[in-house]
Amino acid sequence: QDTQKELKAAGFSTELQKATVAAIRKLVAKLDWSRSASEWNDYQKTSTYTDAEREIKAAFVAKALQGKEARLVFDLGGNDGTYSRVAANHADYVVCADGDDLVLDGLYRSLRQEGNRQILPAYLDLSDPSPGLGWRGRERAAFFDRGRPDAVLALALLHHLAITGNVPLAELVDWLAAIGGRLVVEFVDPTDPMADRLLANKPPGMHGDYRREVFERLLEARFDVVDRQEFPSGTRTLYHATPRR
């Protein structure tokens, strides 16, 4: 109350407050950005996928999700939201999580322009996700404690976490199982150009366990594999799997 009296005495009336807010709103509305480059902002153009393979991937995601009620889908490493949009046709809400803020900003802007509130772009370093914060870590829940997805997309993701992030395949599969929900996951073979580029920066033999047969064995130990689709290139495989109860 003392503060209100002081503001009133200084001539800071309700009309002045409204005018100040209007001026700030006008200033913020004028703010814009100059698109710059980031590691992944042109991934759809620079990746090694052919148009046919992109269509195969979109069709596989749609098939895995269609006809099954999904309240929430996590698209992990979702980049520009290409497959989040596919998932949104079969789900109430999709969280597109990625570690490239420029890519996510572009997605946010396009969604806002469309009036699309079904997809949420969320910045997240998957190798170091947001923990629980505040008093005893309970005031703001950790990212993966904020919702249990009915389905998870992990497309063109694991090779980055395994090779660049040095996370063992067994840990990655356990992590995906712990998140819960149906899984659509892509394994990129070490002979694939994108994986080979990452391995070129590592000592020979450092990621000897990063092989498709090892991944499939680990996946089948924690999930029931419903469907799989190998790309024409032979270096990438998609899997639709459900967690074992």
Question: Each predicted region: which residue ranges?
Answer:
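Conserved alpha-helix/loop element of class I SAM-dependent methyltransferases that forms part
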Residues: 52-71
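Conserved class I S-adenosyl-L-methionine
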Residues: 69-79
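Conserved SAM-binding loop of SAM-dependent methyltransferases across substrates and taxa
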Residues: 80-92
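Conserved SAM-binding motif I beta-strand of class I
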Residues: 93-98
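S-adenosyl-L-methionine
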Residues: 106-146
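A short, conserved alpha-helix within the catalytic core of class I
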Residues: 136, 160-176
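A conserved beta-strand element that flanks and buttresses the S-adenosyl-L-methionine
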Residues: 153
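Conserved beta-strand signature within the Rossmann-like core of class I S-adenosyl-L-methionine
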Residues: 175-190
